Amino acid sequence: MFQPLVLVPGLRCDAYLWHAVIARLDTTAPVVADVSLDNTISGMASRILAAAPPRFALAGLSMGGYVVLEIIRQAPERVTHLALLDTNARPDSEERKAARRAEMDLVREGKSALVSRLGLPNLLAPANLDGPVAQAVHEMTIRVADAVYLRQQEAIMARPDSRPFLKDIALPTLVGVGAEDKLIPPALSEEMAAAIPGAELVVFPNAGHIPTLEAPDAVATAMKTWLAR
């Protein structure tokens, strides 16, 4: 019997974010959640819960991590396992919000492709910047509609501080992060893993903020171990 698994994408990502990992997980029944319709993290979480099986394992990357933490807040009894990849329990700083607003202004001016290209050095390990992974990430981000991107940024900026809540998580938990993640550095994953009882921290070598595409073998291996807990 296949294990239900809900996978939540990050900002300006679609199901492609998870495709290489899904191909390596042969004991799951994966569903990639839709996070394109809501402008709040709580709204995204509620929509996912309405469509999800009664009980399921749950993984989110980056913005997806903010959403899965909200799902745990709303319905902890429905989740069997929790994975937090390249994400952060802290709220945005005012400096980070200002940077987001500047990017949003560029998108409103029709410069989505420029924003995508400028963002790649923060998303990928240096070794992955010249090659098929970088091109695939760029194509994925511009595939996501500008209106979706703007809604998601609004949701991210308004997210709560999840740090006080981490100690209450009572699930088999994987915290994973690319060793070269510049956008959400590994120290923030270490912080979460230390706060969640029994959490396992896995660092993916030669990967930045998107290890599901940069290091899918390592991510799938960690997730198989996690799902077997």
Annotated model-derived regions:
Residues R73-Q74, R78-R117:
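Flexible "cap/lid" loop of the alpha/beta hydrolase fold
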Residues A207-A220:
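Catalytic histidine-centered segment of alpha/beta-hydrolase-like enzymes
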Residues E190-H209:
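Catalytic histidine neighborhood in serine/cysteine hydrolases
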Residues G60-G64, V68:
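Gly/Ala-rich beta-loop-alpha elbow adjacent to hydrolase catalytic centers
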Residues I169, V175-V177, D181:
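Short beta-strand/loop motif that positions the catalytic acidic residue
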Residues M1-R47, L61:
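Conserved HGGG/HGGXW glycine-rich cap/lid loop of the alpha/beta-hydrolase fold
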Residues L171, P185-A194:
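Short alpha-helix in the alpha/beta-hydrolase fold that links the catalytic acid
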Residues D92-E95, G110-D168:
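Conserved alpha/beta-hydrolase catalytic His-Asp/Glu region
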